[in-house]
Design a protein with these regions (language model features):
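Alpha-helical transmembrane segments and their cytosolic membrane-interface
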Residues: 41-89, 102-107, 172-210, 356-363, ...
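Hydrophobic, membrane-embedded alpha-helices of multi-pass small-molecule transporters
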Residues: 64-80, 224-235, 250, 265-266, ...
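Extracellular loop-to-transmembrane helix junctions
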Residues: 96-126, 143-171, 398
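Short, non-helical or kinked segments that cap or interrupt transmembrane helices
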Residues: 108-112, 130-143, 181-188, 366-374, ...
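Transmembrane helix-bundle signature of multi-pass membrane transporters/permeases
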Residues: 115, 119-123, 145, 161-164, ...
Length: 518
């Protein structure tokens, strides 16, 4: 009997190796449970890498694809793109006297990001050409830094080009895992805690200011301030419940929708105006980057813009690796055995993110790209591979960009701020705390947080990495195992490059009066 069972299993494995997906596919009715059917689908898929993958022949659409595509992916990315563009608008308006960008600009740029990049990099790239590359989405940990990036004199296009080039080099030389090993858990934890805490405080302040500032002909200013407290209080309870029941991947849509409903129910509806017209946004790159009077109002990037963008591009790429590896590990934890062929390829994903970063921004966008976590995590939980949901998601995102009016709701403070709180900043804060497991980690984390407050997170990360890798703080046993290049050359080089770039463009002038060299 045992021999018969092993023969059957060996034959199944042999069939999976030799037969095509179409030959191996069996209808769901032949399986005892839906979960077994989905497991079998993952085990028999053979995605073609940079070849044409077709529905029916190489993969199928299932109801479960709607979970990552509709619930988490689409709603999540509308909130994130809107938040990124609002951060750019606020930061650039503050940084430059001639620039005045507002909500209309943010919505228009978000719609640009939701059209061609969604078509090229969701539908075509991850759907049809390489289903092993996860979708290129939004780099959550960089959102709290966008204001600082703008104030530092950086240029979105310069940042995108540097980020794209560094990302391509990293994926070509397979350097992602090297960067992960260079930054200790204490240093990474401190960085995430600082970004999570400062971001959380800024979102809470924004909701409070919005609620207190509500006024109309019938409503006195300050009389509706309690709405902010109710929105925040209810969302904290919901977030805690979702965490308890392992449904945190639903946090963005549930909490954003809750914020919308509460604000409307308590009478703040007069503040929500649907002004965005149906149609296409301006898709001419010359409009966005061609002059200082329209679009981004920055013109083409200069050498100074590239130098100002350099430290942030280095940090963004360094933060890619743990993000990408985390998404792949999450897939491995949720998928059955023998599904290696459908797991996301970290280097392919990095290549796609790098190209998408440059293409999306060149077309007029301002997103900072990374592996799309709000897509991958629910997809892994739903036991679905990348392509089916990617195609549905890309089509949904493009539809909303053309409709226009959902974007007005997405940038309304009780919606956008709640989405950022539960989708970016609280998870960053929690992830940072989980990384600090002992006194050695807390030393590095403390120095990183202190350095971030004194100067900025980029310089603090580089300095803490140098101190930590040389055993001056943190785990001395870990430091003893590192080579001279890992201890001194790479961390020291990153620190010197970042410091020179910051001093050259006067990034520390407003804080410490250090004049720009250029």
């Amino acid at each position: 009997m045992r021999n018969h069972m092993s023969d059957v299993m060996n034959k199944e494995r042999s069939d999976i190796e030799t037969k095509s997906y179409r030959e191996l596919h069996r209808p769901a009715s032949e399986f005892a449970t839906r979960s077994e059917y989905l497991d079998h689908e993952l085990q028999i898929m053979k995605p073609r890498r940079f070849g044409l993958n077709l529905p029916g022949r190489d993969f199928r659409f299932e109801l479960e694809d709607l979970v990552p595509a509709l619930v988490a992916g689409t709603i999540g990315i509308i909130s994130m793109y809107s938040a990124v563009m609002m951060s750019w608008a606020d930061g650039l308006t503050q940084a430059w006297d001639h620039i005045n960008l507002g909500k209309e600009f943010a919505i228009e740029v978000a719609r640009v990001e939701m059209l061609f990049p969604a078509l090229f990099f969701c539908v075509i790239a991850s759907g049809f050409l390489n289903p092993r590359a996860n979708l290129a989405g939004n780099h959550g940990p960089m959102i709290p830094l966008i204001g600082s990036i703008a104030l530092a004199g950086a240029h979105p296009l310069a940042l995108a080009i540097l980020l794209g080039v560094f990302g391509l080099l990293l994926s070509y030389f397979k350097g992602g895992s090297k960067l992960v090993n260079l930054t200790s858990e204490g240093t990474a934890g401190g960085l995430l805690i600082f970004l999570g805490f400062t971001g959380t405080m800024s979102q809470i302040t924004s909701i409070q200011e919005w609620a207190v500032g509500l006024q109309s002909a019938d409503v006195a200013a300050g009389s509706m301030g309690y709405i902010g407290l109710v929105v925040l209080g209810v969302n904290i309870v919901i977030y805690a419940l979702l965490a308890k029941f392992n449904l945190r991947w639903l946090a963005i849509p549930v909490c954003a929708f809750t914020g919308l409903v509460i604000a409307l129910a308590l009478g703040a509806g007069f503040d929500l105006k649907f002004e965005t017209q149906m149609g296409l946004p301006n898709l001419n790159p010359v409009y966005w980057w061609g002059s200082t009077e329209q679009g981004w109002m920055l013109g083409m990037p200069t050498l100074q813009h590239f130098i100002a963008s350099l430290p942030f591009a280095i940090l963004a790429v360094a933060m890619w690796s743990p993000d990408f590896l985390g998404h792949r590990i999450f897939q491995e934890l949720n998928y059955p055995k023998r599904t290696e062929k459908v797991l996301m390829d970290v280097d392919d994903t990095m290549t796609m993110c790098s190209i998408r970063q440059m293409v999306g921004t060149a077309l007029g966008g301002g997103n900072i790209t990374s592996s799309w976590g709000t897509y991958m995590i629910p997809a892994a939980i739903a036991k679905r591979p990348i392509p089916g949901g990617a195609i549905i998601l890309g089509c949904l995102v493009m539809t909303i960009a053309i409709l226009g009016f959902p974007m007005d709701a997405a940038v309304w403070p009780p919606v956008m701020r709640c989405a950022l709180l539960v989708g970016v900043f609280l998870p960053l804060l929690e992830a940072g705390m989980q990384m600090i497991k002992n006194t050695k980690d807390s030393q590095a984390a403390g120095i990183c947080i202190f350095g971030s407050a004194v100067v900025n997170p980029v310089l603090a990360w580089a300095l803490t990495m140098l101190l930590d890798n040389n055993g001056l703080i943190g785990d001395k046993e870990r430091a003893a195992k590192l080579s001279f290049i890992d201890k001194v050359v790479i961390p020291g080089g990153v620190l010197i490059i970042c410091l020179i770039a910051m001093l050259a463009v006067g990034m520390l002038e407003s804080q410490y009066g250090l004049q720009a060299w250029l």
